[in-house]
Regions:
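A structural motif
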Residues: 1-338
C-alpha cells in the first residue's frame, strides 16, 4: 500500500485499511480507544488489483485509489472516499486511465490539499508521472502529465503544512521532487537529488511550515532524510529491507519525528529524533512479536496526541496495535491483536 493505512478520522476514531485478495477491507474503533469492528469491504463488490493508494485531508476524510481489472487485459483506476470510520465508504467510482485506456501501470499515490481535493499520481510504463486532481466543487480535472522522465514505480505524495501538494519519485540515479507553487496548480518539477535508492523505500512527511522531508534507504543500507534545498542526511542504518513509516509527535515536550520499520529480525523497530535535526542521531529499539515477511507498520497519533502503531499482514490478515504509555520516554503498551 502507498500512504498511511492507519489513520485518525474526523470523529477521533482510528481506522485501518487492509488489502485482502481482490478487495480492500476497513476496520475501525467502535469508540475512541475501545473495541474494533469486524473487517468490512470498502466500496462495494468491485474487484480490484492488490494495490492501494491512500491520502487524508485536514478534514479527516480518507481518499482511496486502486486499479480494477477490465476486459482484454486492460485496467482502470477507481476512487472511493471515506468520511466517517464507522460508516461505509462510497462505492468505487471509475476515474479512467492516464492514457485513456490500457494496462495497469504503477501503484498510485494520493495527497489531499487544504481544500479537500484529492490528487492522484500514477507512474507510467514509459517513465512518466500522470496527475488526476479533483475539482473543488466536484468532478475531476483532465489527466495531466508532469515533467520528468525515467520515473520508477516508487512514488511518495505528501501535503505540506501550507496545504500544497508535493510528490517524490525515484529515478535510476536519484529522487525527483514536484511541488505546487499555489493551491490548485499543477505541481512543478523542482531540484533533483543524486543518490541510489532501494526500491520501495520512499516515505514523505510534512515536518515544518515550509518543508516536507522524504525518507529513503540508500543502496548502502542507510536510512536517509532529504529536504529539498538542503543536503541529505543519514539518520540511522535501516532496521530492515522494507519501507519506513513516520509521524511527528510530542515526546516529553519536544517536537520529534518517530520512525518505525519491520526489522531484519521480523519485529517492529522504533527510532525517534528531534524533528529536522537529523544530526542529533537516532537508534532503533525493537518491540513486539516476530511478524510475517509481508507485514508493514503504520503510525499515527490519537485524539490526545498519543502515538499509536499498527502492523498488518496481507497473507495472514493479522492486525496488531500498540500505543505509547502515559509516562516519560517512548515506552509502549503490550501489542494486542484486534
Amino acid at each position: 500500500m502507498n500512504g498511511d493505512w492507519l489513520i485518525r478520522g474526523r470523529d477521533g476514531r482510528l481506522s485501518v485499511y487492509q488489502l485482502s485478495g481482490d478487495a480492500v477491507l476497513c476496520r475501525s474503533e467502535r469508540g475512541r480507544g475501545g473495541a474494533w469492528t469486524a473487517p468490512r469491504t470498502v466500496g462495494g463488490e468491485q474487484k480490484l488489483h492488490p494495490v492501494l493508494g491512500i491520502g487524508q485531508g485536514i478534514d479527516g476524510y480518507a481518499h482511496l485509489v486502486s486499479w480494477r481489472p477490465m476486459t482484454n487485459g486492460e485496467s482502470g483506476l477507481v476512487h472511493s472516499a471515506h468520511f466517517r470510520p464507522h460508516l461505509g465508504a462510497l462505492d468505487w467510482n471509475p476515474v479512467g486511465h492516464p492514457r485513456g485506456q490500457g494496462r495497469r501501470t504503477g501503484a498510485p499515490a494520493v495527497a489531499v490539499d487544504a481544500q479537500g481535493r484529492a490528487h492522484v499520481f500514477v507512474p507510467g510504463e514509459d517513465g512518466t508521472v500522470s496527475l488526476l486532481a479533483q475539482k473543488e466543487k466536484g468532478g475531476w480535472e483532465p489527466w495531466r502529465e508532469l515533467k520528468g522522465s525515467s520515473v520508477q514505480d516508487c512514488l511518495a505524495a505528501a501535503t505540506g503544512e501550507s496545504g500544497r501538494v508535493e510528490l517524490y519519485a525515484t529515478v535510476p540515479d536519484g529522487i525527483l521532487h514536484w511541488r505546487q507553487q499555489e493551491p490548485g496548480a499543477q505541481p512543478v518539477l523542482q531540484e533533483a537529488l543524486q543518490t541510489q535508492v532501494r526500491p520501495g523505500t520512499l516515505y514523505a512527511l510534512a515536518t515544518s511550515a515550509d518543508s516536507t522531508t522524504v525518507f529513503y534507504t540508500d543502496v548502502s543500507g542507510d536510512l536517509c532524510a532529504w529536504r529539498p534545498g538542503d543536503e541529505p542526511a543519514v539518520v540511522v542504518a535501516s532496521a530492515g529491507p522494507g519501507p519506513v513509516s513516520a509521524v511527528r509527535c510530542d515526546i516529553d515536550g519536544h517536537d520529534c519525528t518517530l520512525l518505525a520499520q519491520r526489522s531484519a529480525s521480523g519485529r517492529v523497530a522504533f527510532a525517534a529524533y528531534p524533528t529536522e535535526l537529523e544530526s542529533a542521531g537516532a537508534w532503533w529499539t525493537e518491540s513486539g512479536p516476530q511478524l510475517s515477511l509481508d507485514a508493514t507498520v503504520s503510525l499515527t497519533t490519537d485524539d490526545n496526541g498519543r502515538v499509536v502503531a499498527a502492523t498488518s499482514s496481507p497473507s495472514t490478515g493479522q492486525l496488531l496495535l500498540t500505543a505509547r504509555k502515559d509516562e516519560p520516554g517512548l515506552a509502549l503498551e503490550a501489542w494486542r491483536q484486534v
